[in-house]
From Swiss-Prot:
Protein name: SEC14-like protein 3
Ranges for domain GOLD: 275-383
Record's keyword terms, sorted: Lipid-binding, Transport
PROSITE patterns: CRAL_TRIO, GOLD
Organism encoding this protein: Homo sapiens (Human)
SMART domains from the UniProt entry: CRAL_TRIO_N (SM01100), SEC14 (SM00516)
Stretches that traverse the bilayer: none
Lineage: Eukaryota, Metazoa, Chordata, Craniata, Vertebrata
GO molecular function: lipid binding
Domain CRAL-TRIO residues, every copy: 76-249
Purpose: Probable hydrophobic ligand-binding protein; may play a role in the transport of hydrophobic ligands like tocopherol, squalene and phospholipids.
Presence of the UniProt keyword Mitochondrion in the record: no
One Gene Ontology cellular component: extracellular exosome
Matching InterPro entries: CRAL-TRIO_dom (IPR001251), CRAL-TRIO_dom_sf (IPR036865), CRAL/TRIO_N_dom (IPR011074), CRAL/TRIO_N_dom_sf (IPR036273), GOLD_dom (IPR009038), GOLD_dom_sf (IPR036598), SEC14/CRAL-TRIO_domain (IPR051064)
Pfam families associated with the record: CRAL_TRIO
Length: 400
């Protein structure tokens, strides 16, 4: 049995009744204490009564902390309203709302230099409440319960800038909050125009997604427009995505409903860096260098680094070793990212590199040009692996 209203086994029905009894003290404070709502929490924990109750009570604390009862009255900062991509637009063939996330135009540094992480998370929670409100309106319009949504992630333009660690951490926290506080609301998450970096991005988010959510993620291949039309009628799908829906002025992107973001003007910045905790620190003597090696076992991995120096600039470059088992000088290795000097004492430096081949990559901090000063360098380096199951993303969409 699916565990949904009208499709409960006798044991599930008994568990639901017991669950309602156990949480009767919080029922008046719930947004909608009907069986549909309570069953979401039970399904999220496989009808484990104790775990479901703990999850629901934690959700009630979340509502208080985030002031969810009034979040729709809250207005996000101007920067977010203008430049945070995404929006509600249309419905699938069953009447479920469709939310679009437009990844490419997202300006990671611009956002986090202009607003706080809490502003971003609060905006995302506000979006969730907007979507649930739309589900309630659809329930009234159609005369049947609408409790799930379709999400479309447009990954065109997904690039290394989107793997900036502070932004990744915001999205990881967001997906964690979604799983804990909005369980069983996702019908499908459809990925379109996935780039070669998508498997890396998916692997970063996967630990924060439940098994149930992962099963609902479908990556559409080259025929993604046809795939979307299997779920969404042409008149409900923006022309930009293969349908016939446009703005009143004929714009195929439906800009009145979907924000496409863009680069944020530096005049809107309120800070020029995000505080970073580094994993390593090293003192590099004058006239010397420090090398850090990372073995990359297969192409497509991403090297991601952040570093800062104390008091003066530092050279930095990335190389590929030509001989294994011994230290090589820079001139003996293959240049991958040519060494140059960075003012990392003024602004922390960060970067990414997609490894096009397997081998041992060397990140080299260069102080050979300094004949007077030693340099202290603090750094964090990570190897981001692509998800093996997502490396071949040519699934055909089969509506369930």
């Amino acid at each position: 049995m699916s565990g949904r209203v009208g499709d409960l086994s006798p044991k599930q029905a008994e568990t639901l009744a017991k669950f309602r009894e156990n949480v009767q003290d919080v029922l008046p404070a719930l947004p909608n204490p009907d069986d549909y709502f309570l069953l979401r929490w039970l399904r999220a924990r496989n009808f484990d009564l104790q775990k479901s109750e703990a999850l629901l009570r934690k959700y009630m604390e979340f509502r208080k902390t985030m002031d969810i009862d009034h979040i729709l009255d809250w207005q996000p900062p101007e920067v977010i309203q203008k430049y945070m991509p995404g929006g509600l637009c249309g419905y699938d063939r069953d009447g479920c709302p469709v939310w679009y996330d437009i990844i490419g135009p997202l300006d990671p540094k611009g956002l986090l230099f202009s607003v706080t992480k809490q502003d971003l998370l609060k905006t995302k929670m506000r979006d969730c409440e907007r979507i649930l409100h739309e589900c309630d309106l659809q329930t009234e319009r159609l005369g049947k319960k609408i409790e799930t949504i379709v999400m479309i992630f447009d990954c065109e333009g997904l690039g290394l800038k989107h793997f900036w660690k502070p932004l990744v951490e915001v999205y990881q926290e967001f997906f964690g909050l979604l799983e804990e506080n909005y369980p069983e609301t996702l019908k499908f998450m459809l990925i379109v125009k996935a780039t070669k970096l998508f498997p890396v991005g998916y692997n970063l988010m996967k630990p924060f997604l439940s098994e149930d959510t992962r099963r609902k993620i479908i990556v559409l291949g080259n025929n993604w427009k046809e795939g979307l039309l299997k779920l969404i009628s042409p008149e409900e799908l923006p022309a930009q995505f293969g349908g016939t829906l446009t703005d009143p002025d004929g714009n195929p992107k439906c800009l009145t409903k979907i924000n496409y973001g863009g680069e944020i003007p530096k005049s809107m910045y309120v800070r020029d860096q995000v505080k970073t905790q580094y994993e390593h620190s090293v003192q590099i003597n004058r006239g010397s260098s420090h090398q850090v090696e990372y073995e990359i076992l297969f192409p497509g991995c991403v090297l991601r680094w952040q570093f800062s120096s104390d008091g003066a600039d530092i050279g930095f470059g990335v190389f590929l070793k030509t001989k294994m088992g011994e230290r090589q000088r820079a001139g003996e290795m293959t240049d991958v990212l040519p060494s140059q000097r960075y003012n990392a004492h003024m602004v922390p430096e960060d970067g990414n590199l997609t490894c096009s081949e397997a081998g041992v990559y060397v990140l080299r901090f260069d102080n050979t040009y300094s004949f007077v000063h030693a340099k202290k360098v603090s750094f964090t380096v990570e190897v981001l692996l692509p998800d093996e199951g997502m490396q071949k993303y040519d699934k055909e969409l089969t509506p369930v």
